Amino acid sequence: MVSHRLTRFRPLRSASTKDAAGQASVPEPPAHMRAIVFDEPGAAGVLREDTVPVPTPVLSELLVRVIAAGVNPIDAKTRSGAGVYGALSDQPHSLGFDFSGVVVSTPYESHPLPPGTEVFGMTAFPRSPGSYADYAVVPTLAVARKPAALSHVEAAAVPLAALTAWGLVVETAHAHEGQRVLIHAGGGGVGHFAVQLASYFGAQVIATGSATNLPWLRELGASVVIDYASTRFEDVVGTVDVVIDLIGNVHDDTGTRSLSVLRPGGLYILVPTGAWPGYADAAEAAGVRATSYKVVPDGSVLATLARLLDSGAIRVFVDRVYDLAEAEAAHREIERGHTRGKIVLSVSDC
């Protein structure tokens, strides 16, 4: 699936070796694998299962056997010709940015993640998706050991969404005690992590969502929950320090209305930017700060998230699981919206 790679290598730690601690051996990968691909952008029906060569990693990458792959809105947008479609170069195009699986080969001896290690992480975002497949090549610095408390299906639901939430809540909003944070779409993949992280770091969380998700959002840590269908949030939230907007102006001018509840100098954070191209000018006119955020794959942050997940400080919710061959149905589901937590593809048995 991955082409145009300039430096290839024969892995020094092969799938048939054991480490000094007796790391279980991993079967050598086959020459070919199953993968979900598409030739031209379009509706979910353009997705198809194909047999393609197992990818060859470069010196900074691991080869992993994918056990489960997360499905994200960016996947469906990219398939339709939006999202990060312009960054793709391979033909046919692959999809899938996050995964959980097992290391098959490493670029050098004494690698901290030897063959047989259970890991979770991201492929090279945005240029090289590929987790909708039996095997994937992934940047060494974009993976971490899988949380021991999670199944592979649960772990595959974490990387892209939780890393995005961490970037929003911790690195951009700098969530802290006494801060009031409004999070739109708190029940989605990114949203349910953002609610938990903001609450964990001491912020007072106000979350919007569907009526059926409101009790669950309270369980996740939101102190105020708002049914977006029946209540205009600006009528009840008062003034907030930060708005994390996972909707933008796609629905009911949510972005524009959010600016009115921010304190002077407050911070508006938009994901994704395409949902409201004029957000920066509107924020300046309203006397508030504004920025956008795009996920950065980071294994060290994933390791921190793994510790939080293992301790029970945060949790992941998987709404539905589809087989790899059902990727089309998974895309149709995520495009319908109103998902609670994440959708995951089950790629292989452990």
What annotation goes with each model-predicted range?
Residues 88, 122-185:
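NAD(P)H dinucleotide-binding glycine-rich loop of Rossmann-like/cofactor-binding domains
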Residues 235-242:
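A short acidic, Gly/Pro-enriched loop at the edge of an enzyme's catalytic core
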Residues 4-23, 28-31, 301-350:
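C-terminal hydrophobic helical "lid"/dimerization subdomain
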Residues 159-227:
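Mid-domain Rossmann-like dinucleotide-binding core that forms the NAD(H)/NADP(H) cofactor-binding site
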Residues 9-10, 17-29, 40-67, 90-94, ...:
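A short N-terminal beta-strand-loop micro-motif at the entrance of redox/enzyme domains
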Residues 53-71, 83-125:
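Glycine-rich beta-strand-centered segment in the early N-terminal region that forms part
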Residues 249-314, 346-350:
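Glycine-rich phosphate-binding loop and adjacent beta-alpha segment
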